[in-house]
Amino acid sequence: MLGTDRCVVEEWLSEFKALPDTQITSYAATLHRKKTLVPALYKVIQDSNNELLEPVCHQLFELYRSSEVRLKRFTLQFLPELMWVYLRLTVSRDRQSNGCIEALLLGIYNLEIADKDGNNKVLSFTIPSLSKPSIYHEPSTIGSMALTEGALCQHDLIRVVYSDLHPQRETFTAQNRFEVLSFLMLCYNSAIVYMPASSYQSLCRMGSRVCVSGFPRQHEKHWKELCGRIVLDPEFMVQLLTGVYYAMYNGQWDLGQEVLDDIIYRAQLELFSQPLLVANAMKNSLPFDAPDSTQEGQKVLKVEVTPTVPRISRTAITTASIRRHRWRREGAEGVNGGEESVNLNDADEGFSSGASLSSQPIGTKPSSSSQRGSLRKVATGRSAKDKETASAIKSSESPRDSVVRKQYVQQPTDLSVDSVELTPMKKHLSLPAGQVVPKINSLSLIRTASASSSKSFDYVNGSQASTSIGVGTEGGTNLAANNANRYSTVSLQEDRLGQAGEGKELLSPGAPLTKQSRSPSFNMQLISQV
């Protein structure tokens, strides 16, 4: 300690002792102007063998017990450095040099837990109402509250939480050491906005040293003195993080990041969940660059104001909304594939297209939007297979058959997907009693074109196909196919039952299709509208 610093400290000690009570207020207003006093006091506190340490601790306690608030804050700025020296001396078991600092810490603690009458204080914490807006949340995100009599009664109710009573302590023990130090850190954090920059630096240095002392990370620091391992408490580390978080945004960005990493390092080794939770939340919320410290006297944290536009959609996801989304997607896919041919689903999937306009009530739509979307989706998957089948049939047809087929295909120009309906049927159909399959040679289609669709086209008759065309009185086209039809597996099994009903009367043009009149295979009825 230099002679000039010693003279400054001795002058400060003698000045306050001779100060009358009427001048304490003016003395407190001019105390912060002594720029050389604070660094000199730090040097006295750091040197445990200094003879001025005991009178300095006594003088700091007298300032704290005075009625002037600014004198209390002057003593509080040295609190982090006093804690570090106390913990370092406790580990080294130097009880003689530690007595005055221990008495000062206990004196501040006992003054804070009691009021003027000597009764223990009860600390109160106000819980803000979530129904009122703040810079941290929007009340609309919570949901609408029911306007009841109970809600109206509790609208302006302020909820207050009270802490337990803190007993007075006469000495430090291993059981109550960090209980006292945690409470002292709480008092320091409550007045941290009034602390100078030197106090923030002392807080960061104290946090790094108490966390890494006695661990391998200590050798990476540029400290002159080495210290043993210091036992820490999770609550004390959380209070330490509270002060460090404020110091980082008020001029101590580099020191704050260093102590934050050291606290995380120690909390991971000790498996302290609460300090880990707070420290990781602080680290993840830090900006990439240091905050703007050009504005002098800035004593607030920069907090992002809640945006006016909500960032998270509050639309409830229900079964109905998922169904509507699926229908919209199928409708969009159906519009893209609207020009493609319409084919029926596979026979093994259990769907049949026995739809007829005459079999439906007047005023009802024969198909829904979802069914049309399904038909268009099926059409894209089966177009390649149908092209191969059509090319195989073309190769076996005569020139005349091809001309006839072209004329037949060009006939129903007014067909639309709206005249097609899917109706669920069973996979395996059985003929009812007395029902026979009409012979294929006697089939004549009047105004209805029956297109058989099946997954397995296993059997194709190799004989030459003959086709005849007959035009009815109403302009309908009749097509008779001989030995050129494609049979499904179900059709081949039913053909073995016998051909007893060859002369059975066929359907009339206007008669609706019934279960007996439909083909047992899965077919799709395309109705031409005149």
UniProtKB/Swiss-Prot annotation:
* Keywords noted in UniProt: Cell membrane, Cytoplasm, Membrane, Phosphoprotein
Segments passing through the bilayer: none
Q: Which residues carry this modification: Phosphoserine?
A: 321, 341, 430, 442, 444, 491
From start to end residue, where is composition biased (Polar residues)? 353-373, 514-530
> Which stretches does the entry tag as region Disordered?
328-410, 502-530
Q: Which Pfam families match?
A: Hyccin
A GO cellular component term found in this entry reads:
cytosol
Provide the primary localization: cytoplasm
Instruction: Write down the InterPro entries for this protein, in alphabetical order.
Output: Hyccin
Name its cellular compartments: Cytoplasm, Cytosol; Cell membrane
Residues recorded with modification Phosphothreonine: 30, 306
- Gene Ontology terms: biological process: phosphatidylinositol phosphate biosynthetic process; protein localization to plasma membrane
Q: Which PANTHER family match?
A: HYCCIN 2, HYCCIN RELATED
Similarity remark: Belongs to the Hyccin family.
Q: What biological function has been recorded for the protein in this entry? A: Component of a complex required to localize phosphatidylinositol 4-kinase (PI4K) to the plasma membrane.
Assembly and partners?
Component of a phosphatidylinositol 4-kinase (PI4K) complex, composed of PI4KA, EFR3 (EFR3A or EFR3B), TTC7 (TTC7A or TTC7B) and HYCC (HYCC1 or HYCC2).
- What is the name attached to this protein's record? Hyccin 2
Q: Which organism is it from?
A: Homo sapiens
